[in-house]
Amino acid sequence: MSESNSIAPAPAPAPVADENEALARSVILIVDDNAQNVELLQAYLEALPCRIVTAFDGIQAMKYIDDPDQAKPDLILLDVMMPKMSGFEVCQKIKEDPATRSIPIMMVTALNELGDIERGVEAGTDDFLTKPVNKLELITRVKSLLRVRHLKRELDRTMAYIEDIENRAQKNEPGGPVG
C-alpha cells in the first residue's frame, strides 16, 4: 500500500491511572444535616487523597450537583433523615437524571431496618452503611465504589475509542484500522 493510501491509527485512550492517582482526582460529596456527622466523615476520609465537599441538606446537595461550574462528585455519602428533602428523594432525583445517574451513592444513616435498606435500593443507592460508622469499613467501601466509578469511566472511554475506529473504518477515513 502506498503512503498516500495508508490510514493513520486514531490515538488510543489514556492508560488506566493507578488507584492513588484516581483517588487524588476524586470528589466526594458528604450530605448530612448534622455538622458533627459531616466532621466525623471528613476526619475518617482524611487518609484518602480525595477532595471533600459538603452540603447540609438535600436542596444544597442538588444545587451543588446541578451547578455547571462545579465538578460532578465521583461519590456521594448521603444521610437519609434530613429536613427539606430526604436522602431517599435526593437519591431518586440523582438516579433519574441521565447526567448524574452513574454517580455512586452510599446512604450513611441511623436507619437500619430491612425496609429502610429496601427503600434505599429502590431509590437507587449503590451502598447502605448504618451509623455509627466504622472508619475502616467506610474507607474500604469508599475505595471500592470509587474504583468501580473510575473503571467504568475507563471502559466508557475505551468503548468510545472503539466506536470511533469502527466509524472511521466504515467511512474509510484516516485514523481507522489498516486492512
Residue ranges and their predicted role:
Residues M82:
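Receiver (REC) domain active-site loop signature in two-component systems and cognate sites
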Residues D79, T109:
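Active-site residues of response regulator receiver
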Residues V133-V142, L146, H150:
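C-terminal output helix
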